[in-house]
Amino acid sequence: MLMPKRVKHRKVQRGRMKGKATRGNFIAYGDYGIQATECGWITSNQIESARIAINRYIRRGGKLWIKIFPDKPVTQKPAETRMGSGKGTPEYWVAVVKPGRVLFELTGVDEETAREAMRLAAHKLPVKTKFVKKSDFEEVGGEINEG
C-alpha cells in the first residue's frame, strides 16, 4: 500500500478540488497513458488494484509508471461515537486528482494491449478516465499542447 514515509502534519483538512491539473498532465515516460477527465480522491488501495490489473494483462511485456501518489491522510471516527472530542484518526491515504492528470503510463506493448490494460485499470478507479497516446501531446515551441 502506498503512503508517505513521514509527514509534517498527521491530519489535514479536506480541501476542495477546483480547476484543471497544471502539473502531470502530459505523458512524460511511456507511449500510452490513462488521463482523468473528472476530479476525485483515489485511495492507495485503488491505485494498487489498478496496477495489479494492468500488470496481469500485460504480463512481462511492458513497463508501467504510476504518476500519482497518495499523500493526503483521510481521518475517520469510530462507529457509534458521539460528535465532538476531536478529529478522528488517519485511516487511509488518498491522491487528489484533477481533470487532465495522467494517472498511469505504459510502454513496451502495442496499442491494442495498452488500450485493454488501461480499460481494465479504469474499472478499478473512482474517476472517469480516457486513453491517451504520446502523439496526442505535441510539442510546439517548447510548450506542450494537447492536440
UniProtKB/Swiss-Prot annotation:
Signal peptide: none annotated. Part of the 50S ribosomal subunit. This is Large ribosomal subunit protein uL16. HAMAP family: Ribosomal_uL16. GO terms for molecular function: rRNA binding; structural constituent of ribosome; tRNA binding. GO terms for biological process: translation. SUPFAM superfamilies: Ribosomal protein L16p/L10e. Belongs to the universal ribosomal protein uL16 family. Binds 23S rRNA and is also seen to make contacts with the A and possibly P site tRNAs. InterPro entries: Ribosomal_uL16, Ribosomal_uL16_bact-type, Ribosomal_uL16_CS, Ribosomal_uL16_dom, Ribosomal_uL16_sf. Keywords: Ribonucleoprotein, Ribosomal protein, RNA-binding, rRNA-binding, tRNA-binding. GO terms for cellular component: cytosolic large ribosomal subunit. CDD domains: Ribosomal_L16_L10e. It comes from Clostridium tetani (strain Massachusetts / E88).
